[in-house]
Amino acid sequence: DDWAIIIGGDSHTRMSKGVAFGADSGTVALALATGEVTMPIPDSVKVTFKGSMKNYMDFRDVVHATQAQMLEQCSENVFQGRIIEVHIGTLLADQAFTFTDWTAEMKAKASICISEDATLIESLEIAKTRIQTMIDKGMDNSENTLNGLIDIANNRIKQINSGEKPALAPDENAKYFAEVVVDLDKIDEPMIADPDVYNEDISKRYTHDTIRPISYYSSKKKVDLGFVGSCMVHKGDMKILAQVLKNIETKHGAVNFKAPLVVAPPTYNIVDELKEEGDWDILQKYAGFEFDDDAPKGSARVEYENILYLERPGCNLCMGNQEKASKGDTVMATSTRLFQGRVVADAEDKKGESLLASTPVVVLSTIPVSYTHLRAHETRI
């Protein structure tokens, strides 16, 4: 429900169509016990966009560029401790999560993607389909909670269509702490969030504020492991992964990995959808490992071969207490975590680092194909 005010203890998975505020466990417990909570509501920062997104760029690059252009325009992080109001009305919920799940990394309190009526309805219809799939699998409870969610979605769609309650929108006279305008025309190459582990100023390491274009690395950055997963990815990312593999196979005859690529799909239902739509086939074709819930691994993996790993849906490497990369590795990941020791720990002779990027960049960083200029990236995508 885009009108819901939600309080929770998770630093990520901010609601893409509602407003969600992270809180400590005690505050959440108080809200559950009393139905009320006292929280200071910070100012908002309005983010609008101009220009056009190039067809070979990924929305993840827009998210990173938003942070970089904000710092350039404002000279300081105006998102910190505030609410980010994203004005792209045509973002479906899956895409919107790519922005709102980066909220914590922008140091903001919360964020919301303003939605047009038609887009909100489409997001609700997608949600209904996925909930129905869960019901068909026998996942509803005795109180029919999942069926109740479909009823809520249908009622919300009715409210929008009738004009009784359109999609949530700011007041015409809304006031903002600051306004940031993101120029999409300036985003002409993939953007990387770099932990900058060797910065002489220790305070500038592991901050998420160092956003660099891929050309900064001049194709000289060796990637030891790639990871596609976490709350930053959705079904579309899995389809992009499948299509990139198909494109490379068509041009080169086969796909060979120069580094391990770990893939953790968002949900089991999405895995089923990918199977129905044919995208899972090529992932299976090149997978050296595929998860099997009937024969689970006995322990977390800490050593990897140069193959594609299809892991079970979940946080995987991003969680930090499940799988881990080898100490001292350079990891290219779609996740949100670049903190020291989270995804990869330091080795005695080399710092571990987790660079964050879009799904296409992560995939291509593990495959030995020519990737020395932007045109190569455009062709692969």
Map each language-model feature to its residues:
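Long, structured ligand/cofactor-binding scaffold of large enzymes
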Residues: 1-33, 37-40
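Conserved small/polar residues in nucleotide/adenosyl-binding loops
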Residues: 372-381
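A structural-propensity feature for long, helix-poor, extended segments
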Residues: 34-74, 269, 273-275, 279-280
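Short glycine-rich or small-residue beta-strand-to-loop segments that form or flank ligand, phosphate
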Residues: 8, 48-50, 85-87, 224-229, ...
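Thiamine diphosphate
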Residues: 258, 268-359
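Short coil/turn connectors at secondary-structure junctions
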Residues: 1-4, 9-11, 40-45, 78-83, ...
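Accessory "access/gating" subregions that flank catalytic or transport cores
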Residues: 1, 109-255, 263-289, 303-307, ...
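Structured alpha-helical segments in the cores of large, soluble enzyme domains
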Residues: 27-38, 62-76, 99-100, 206-216, ...
